[in-house]
Amino acid sequence: DTYTVGEAPAELYTDDILESAKDTTAIVVLSRDSSEASDYSTNMKDPNGDSFDTPMSISAYEKEMIQLAKENSNGKVIVLINSDVPMEIQELKDDPEIGAILWTGLPGMNGFLGVCDVLSGDVNPSGHISDTYATSSVSAPAMTNFGLYTYTNASNAESGAELTEADKGDW
């Protein structure tokens, strides 16, 4: 199964659209969705068929859109993460031209009214979510259990010798 992000390629943004962004703060929205039995695909593609770096990374089209926003705004770019699943956004965090990143989750019909309050400065989102996301999927603690491991006491088991309690470990 292939999952695509519905971002348009940069060439579809007309001069009129780009001109309308001049002297404004650009707001870029990156979205992902998932649901039961519809998690991340291992085959993430842009609409033109280009693969993502990883299933959680930002697509090439999204990177182009962010670059256009930086080039055609007043230099202030805010990225909204409209997603209920983790995304790898370290490159956004490290980009000095990104002024703010706000995770909105999936706020439903009225939740973006609260997002508008944050963007206008009426509310300060100083709280923290209880979830912690790894900056890279391979740095997540669960990944330490993946891989091929060699056991030093494997020869005992192969020879038919009975394992001692010390060999069995405290499982």
Predicted region positions:
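C-terminal non-catalytic regions of proteins with extracellular/luminal or membrane-system context
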Residues: 1-171
